[in-house]
Each structure stands twice: as C-alpha cells, then as structure tokens.
Regions:
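An alpha-helical support segment within catalytic cores of ATP-dependent transferases
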Residues: 1-20, 123-140
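Short, well-structured alpha-helical segments
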Residues: 1-5, 72, 86
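Active-site acidic catalytic loop and adjacent metal/ATP-binding pocket
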Residues: 4-50
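Conserved acidic
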Residues: 14, 67, 85
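Short beta-strand segments
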Residues: 17-19, 38, 90, 96-99
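Active-site activation/catalytic loop segments of kinase-like enzymes and analogous catalytic loops
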Residues: 49-80, 93-111
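ATP/Mg2+ or Mg2+-diphosphate-binding catalytic cores
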Residues: 66, 77, 99-140
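Active-site-adjacent helix/loop segment of glycosyltransferases
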Residues: 84-91
Length: 140
C-alpha cells in the first residue's frame, strides 16, 4: 500500500468541484444524451481523477474493464492527464467497490438472490491488474 500512496500526486492536481458518488446510477438520460446528474450530497473540491476512477469502478463491475478503459480514454482525450494519476485513484476506488460487492453479495444471498458477483469480482481484479501495470509503466 505504501508503494501506491507514494505515487499519489498530492497537491499537484487542480481541485475541481467533484460529485463524490459519480456512477451510472446518478446520471439521467433523455433521448440518448445526458440530461442531468443527481445525488450531490457527497460533492466537494477534489481532483477530477477521483470522480472518473469512482465511475470507472462502477462501469467495470457492470460492463467490464474494456468499457471502463474506453471511458478513461474519452475523458482523458478531453481534459488531458497522466496514467499514473488515474491508476492510483483507480486502485483506491476499486478497493471500495470490492468491499461494497462483498456486502451486497451477503445481502443478496440472505434474500435468496444469486446475481453474478463472481463475474463482477473478476472484472475488478482485471481492473486492478491494469492499474498496477500502468503504475509500473508497462502499459500506457
């Protein structure tokens, strides 16, 4: 963990208004376009990479790491940035997502539901591997 936190770009990224809980469930759509974003109760000033990484973890669980990577490429193409910054925040958010999935799995089992959490966990594991490779410089 110290190797990861040593790479945190503390104080180097501009602070912007962030949502704090940005994921597909908080995005409203109308006729194929984003019409709004709801649930701003966790909003704060933070690095833009946190919201992107948080959303990528959710997208990864739902749709897989390739779609999460496409989201990052589209976003980075607009705002610029480095792989290191996003990789560190990806790791932070993925750990939170794994915890949430574990709690969700237990609750689902108690209610008799058997969703495909194993696939979601496999997606998150691949997301972690990709972030670690970016930090090691083996993937741009």
């Amino acid at each position: 963990m110290s190797a990861i936190t040593a790479r945190l770009p503390l104080g180097t990224s501009a602070r912007v208004l962030t949502h704090g809980d940005f994921h597909p469930g908080n995005v409203l759509w109308h006729r194929g376009r984003i019409s709004g974003v709801v649930d701003w109760s966790a909003a704060r000033l933070d690095t833009r990479w946190y919201d992107l990484a948080y959303c990528r973890a959710s997208v990864c669980v739902l749709l897989g790491p390739d779609i999460a990577d496409r989201l990052a490429a589209a976003y980075s193409g607009i705002v610029g940035g480095t792989a290191d910054e996003l990789a560190v925040y990806d790791l932070m958010c993925v750990f939170s997502s794994r915890h949430y999935l574990a709690e969700s799995l237990a609750a689902d089992r108690e209610q008799g539901h058997v969703p495909n959490h194993q696939m979601s966990l496999a997606h998150l594991d691949e997301h972690v591997r990709r972030a670690l490779r970016r930090l090691d410089g083996t993937v741009s």
